[in-house]
Amino acid sequence: MDKINNITKISQVAPEVTWFLRNLGFSNYYIIKIYDLVGDAAIGLTEDNPYWLLEEFPRMGFDKADQVARKLGVSPESHLRLSAAVTYGLRAYAAEGHAFAPLEEFCEKAAGFLDADTSLIKDVIEDMSFSGDVQLTNLEGRQVLYFYGYYRAECTVAGKLAALAEPPGGLAPVAANIDAVIKKAGQSRGIELSPQQTAAVKNSLVSGVSIVTGGPGTGKTTIIDSIISIMEESGLKTAVAAPTGRAAKRIMETSGYPACTVHRLLEYFYDEETGYMIFGKNSENPLDYDTVIIDEASMLDLMLTEALCNAIKPGTRLILVGDADQLPSVGAGSVLADLIDSDYFFTARLTEIHRQSAESLIVTNAHRINRGESPVYGEDFVLVKADKQQDILDKIVDIASKLSMESIQVLTPVKKGTLGSANLNDRLQQAFNPAGEDKAQLEFGSRVFRVGDRVMQIRNDYRLEYRVQRSTPGQFDSRTDGDTGKGVFNGEIGVIKSVDTEMRTVTVLYDDQRWVEYSYVQLDEIEPAYAITVHKSQGSEFPTVIIPMTWFPPALATRSLLYTAVTRGKKQVIIVGNPGYLEKMTANNQSRSLNSGLKERLVGMYGFY
């Protein structure tokens, strides 16, 4: 359901709804959010199934929904409660990047959480599998539990990619003399492709599905440029996209070729009737391109990859470009790593650092870190020593405040604590954008949103409306001034341009010139972004990156996280803290194992399409 109005005050809520929800223990904040979403239907929906709230307001938590259910007389052993808990638990696994949960492990955790017998949990899971909500299956000799959508996505991606890799009708031919065309493509840009790059381009041209992976400075962008040039000369149509707007913008800046997000390539829209995001491009209305190139492919999650595969017609080249050593996608699945590990598709692994990039200590040290070696320091890769966390915090603020807000980004492994993103943002906001009589601001819980603040959208919201206003129409895609639409995505960064204290709204301008107005109850969807977690920085680059270095939990203080953080810097990386912990982080090659069956489906080829 779509929201019925821009409700911002408790006085705007129907009295009977306020009374009903307040008696169930809801604060004014949630009463307003619920009424804003479903209006008078709030009473009936909640009486029928109080756990509906978890789908719309996941941050509410299961305990709160459970309290409401108890007040409404829902039995602790009811199917309604247990099935809601299974759904909630699988969402928790997905939030950690897992496509499935091992059944026995899941049932034990759920039984402990609910204080229920595991047999009850298994009975409910069996019922849910019959209704098509979840999928029970065997994988590598054990029973595992999927949301049905993730199971379908794995099977679809495996089957579709296998079919694309060997299209029965063949690929649209490029110019006859491939070697000469590749050489000419390099010369047109004043460069000579290395043997590694030449092989990558050549194999991408003759393969239905190919992967190009490598660290910074290994020439991935040059390969993309060369492929685009060859396709244009051959009269073939090419689409270039990336999972995030910032990554798409970077392609535009480096190649001059039009690029967009994968969502926009697939023409996503919010369906008012179903309440789901729909892709206009699909198997019935496929993309009309001969070649599709996806950059920053390490950020592709399982569900977006399924939508992409559904929209690519047979005979289209699909080229995935990314850095497999970076952190995996925020969403469920480990798509790029699984595709590479399956050995099913041609994969070019770029290892040579090219001359111009070799002069950058950021590039040099990224590769050193990836090999488990200590970084070396200089003008563009700086170590500022400090031991105590408070000293590290003070030095970060001091360093950052001497630079422009637009040029720096603080990246940290954690959200909480002295050096977590929340506390860093409080201090950096004071440094960059202190309160003033000429700056409107709005308090929201413990946060203050002020005109001029840098903020980030922290969850996908397909209902959120935007309008486009840019000085150069069509700069990043086909949208023009005045266009409107819906959908703002997790990780998008913008700046607050206005605050209306009377209407309690905040207006944010995002990087691609979309303006979004947030009502008061929507402000939990954004947070300050002077400092962000490393996971949230994926797909972005910043002129100067500042990284605190102290003790962090071993599961987070990993080589891949440090590598990802360092590779976000374009001109300078500044590490502030204890070099001893940097050494430990570099040595910690522990990688988070994600539950994914995509590799096994490709190897066994028991997917369907």
Report the location of each language-model feature.
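Residue-level recognition of short, solvent-exposed, well-ordered loop/turn junctions
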Residues: K313, V448-D453, F489, S537
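C-terminal accessory regions
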Residues: G482-K486, N490-Y609
